[in-house]
Amino acid sequence: MASKVMAEEADMVDVLVIGAGPGGGSAAIHSARAGLKTVVVEADPSVGVPVHCGECLSEMAVQNLDLEIPDHVKALDVKGIRVIFPDGTEKLLTEPGYVLEKHLFEQWLMDEAGTLGSTLHLGHKVTSMERIYNSENQFSNWKIDGKGENFPIYCKAAIDASGVAGASSKLLDMGTEVEVIAGFQYEMTDVENDGYLDFYLWPQYSPHGYVWMIPKKGERANVGLVTTDKKGAIKYLDKFIQDTYLDGKPMVNPQWRDQSVKVRPFGGTIPISGPREVTVEDGVILVGDAAGFTSPLFEGGSHLALWSGREAANVIAKAITTNDLSKASLMAYEAAWKKRFPPYHKILKGKTALYELTDEEMSTMARCLPDELGNMSPFQKLGIGLKILVRKPALLTKRVISVLLSFGYSRAKHFGW
């Protein structure tokens, strides 16, 4: 919907950020830091609650984003990832990072944004977005309405960080829907760890997905999975716990949940089909899950959300100085993420090939890999190909090289976590 009526300058804010997750928090920080009058609206009554993900962030992400994360939001410093294949073969991807208390991390981001001058409205859900054009039929600003006492809000630009549902994609009909996967987890206790995140590629417990054990201090851990079988997800998770060393270990409510309620899993849906076809339109930029930005193999999204929120804010700040918030002007954002993010089509191709392998084929491939997957030399990669050729040449016809490339592009330096 469009209108020729312009808002009063006194009522106008520069940027409205929709959603207070990691993408929204990052966008708010960098918009406010650029001197823009910034407002954030969050549909939920609290920032960071409920938690939707495994809560991990690599040290490389922290460095890439120039973050100084306070200790109180960290649940554990970790060494990297251990991938466990169907026959029990284990391979390490050693790259340091953190398990976060994600609700505290997101609250810290919004506190940082507030310190810089951003305003936060909780319990505010966007239900309509109306573009306003000037007398020359050029985009001028937005009138954004919804449920909440501070609506309507007039703004020059909007950053959609509303998660996989993508408020603006639905309200503005910005293209195709994204494919999603279900992710759920329990918080458990009495779970020992050696500082690695455990990712189990065990299809019997997580069809077209994987199971994880993400450790926290105090012998706590997030134990969860992602699977394309949304209806059966919790049943698969319960079965995995029952059949492994986790059987009998206590399940507890996470810190952010009312401790008087019955213990139950938490999570949600995650985009897995790659970026949306359209991430920019006149006056609006999509970031994080709203843009379809997750690493497709292991569904890591926080690094991508934080980076895209920062980039969106910087592009909009520049566009406001030139008084040009057209799609053509904001396409600098799309050019930036396409240049910086990994080749999604290659990761998706490898992921498809991975889940076409039988358990035996997956394990055979794993036994051909070095014990440490980080920083493999070209000579080592050649050796892997030769081992596969000797042990099970049929694997080469099953696009196993694409699988290995997908693993490589899921590392922290490629925004994997």
What do these predicted regions represent?
Residues 6-21:
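Beta1/beta-strand and adjacent pyrophosphate-binding region of the FAD-binding site
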Residues 19, 161-162, 287:
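Short, well-ordered coil/turn residues at beta-beta hairpins
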Residues 20, 32-51:
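Glycine-rich FAD pyrophosphate-binding loop
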Residues 24-25:
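N-terminal Rossmann-fold NAD(P) dinucleotide-binding loop
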Residues 34, 112-255, 271, 276, ...:
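Predominantly flavin-linked oxidoreductase catalytic cores and closely associated redox partners
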Residues 58-110:
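A conserved beta-strand/loop capping segment in the N-terminal third of enzymes
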Residues 99, 125-128, 231-315, 320-321, ...:
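FAD/FMN-dependent oxidoreductases across multiple families
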Residues 317-417:
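C-terminal helical "tail/cap" subdomain of flavin- and related membrane-associated enzymes
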